[in-house]
């Protein structure tokens, strides 16, 4: 009986070894450092620092559109900074499942230059994270981008 089980185990391992393995090609990953999320009428827009844009009626639809529209595989677990357009705060709970809890959050009045905002936030990290927001802290810092300067009001 033991030899039959051993033979079946060897056969199973052999068959599984012949099946095609589909891994992820790291060259196709599109990691994002900064996301800009805004609501325009009834449509939610999500834009990455890589220039990819997704839109939809829900956050799930916008993320799915973002992933479909990029040439590679958008990887949102690398996002360090979330820029929310003022008035879009209700979208935060819907973003929890896509972003790390340590992702810094700040509000912006208008669309920023995402690359410049990322560079500024690397040296002036906001004190608000998704985890803080989830725990009840609701005062989101405001990032103001001017031509050559940026300010973070906490």
Stretch-by-stretch model annotation:
Residues 1-154:
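Membrane-proximal alpha-helical signals and transmembrane carboxylates
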